[in-house]
């Protein structure tokens, strides 16, 4: 499979490029970045000290024309622009971008009617195993336990709560028959009164170079259960994304997530 990488000069983009170059069965076909990026025109493997013959470009049409699939961990507005071109050219996409609003998510769903799309807030195998653990725990602890989700990321992350934290909330809410949109609490300040027993709380930490920490707490009387996942490197995200791209090889269309990719459904 021929893979192109969006956000090629960013931290995640570089990790994805390195992973594609080191993975059998896939080839690097393109490297995309925004107009004006300092890396435009450079070889995509320059940061590795390795010539690839692929120049970083801002021409989405040219980049996608040479590829079978685009892996995109950028920002919602950029991803949606790339998606429109991918849909028109019939190219698949693996999307790890977070922070989409309802209209953005609908655009992804609409595109998936004609191209294969893997969309997941977190591509890590470990995080997706954690989702399954949370589903089991939530069903067992649905009564008498308060549910709180705490997440921490580096100072540069622009959306909050993280997409992974929200996905964890969705898993828990679905398991206990609640609607996250109705029961989520994202901020507490001042005199808040007693905690609503049916709420799912979120707390966000931003600082330093934290790659990604997530903990779901089930707090009861006399005991507390915590299920945590801590990332020390973006490598797990990159490995999962490339695995997702390979999964799409025989999928002409459809919306998938990492649970599909990993066979956990």
Swiss-Prot record:
Keywords on record: Amino-acid biosynthesis, Cytoplasm, Diaminopimelate biosynthesis, Lysine biosynthesis, NAD, NADP, Oxidoreductase
Localisation: Cytoplasm
Family classification: Belongs to the DapB family.
A single GO BP: diaminopimelate biosynthetic process
Annotated protein name in UniProt: 4-hydroxy-tetrahydrodipicolinate reductase
Domain of life assignment: Bacteria
Residues annotated for (S)-2,3,4,5-tetrahydrodipicolinate binding in this entry: 154, 163-164
Coiled coil: none
Record PROSITE patterns: DAPB
Catalytic activity: (S)-2,3,4,5-tetrahydrodipicolinate + NAD(+) + H2O = (2S,4S)-4-hydroxy-2,3,4,5-tetrahydrodipicolinate + NADH + H(+); (S)-2,3,4,5-tetrahydrodipicolinate + NADP(+) + H2O = (2S,4S)-4-hydroxy-2,3,4,5-tetrahydrodipicolinate + NADPH + H(+)
Enzyme Commission (EC) number: 1.17.1.8
Keyword Metal-binding set for record: no
Residue sites binding NAD(+) per the record: 7-12, 33, 96-98, 120-123
Role, per record: Catalyzes the conversion of 4-hydroxy-tetrahydrodipicolinate (HTPA) to tetrahydrodipicolinate.
Single GO term (MF): NADP binding
GO CC annotations on file: cytosol
Organism of this sequence: Cupriavidus metallidurans (strain ATCC 43123 / DSM 2839 / NBRC 102507 / CH34)
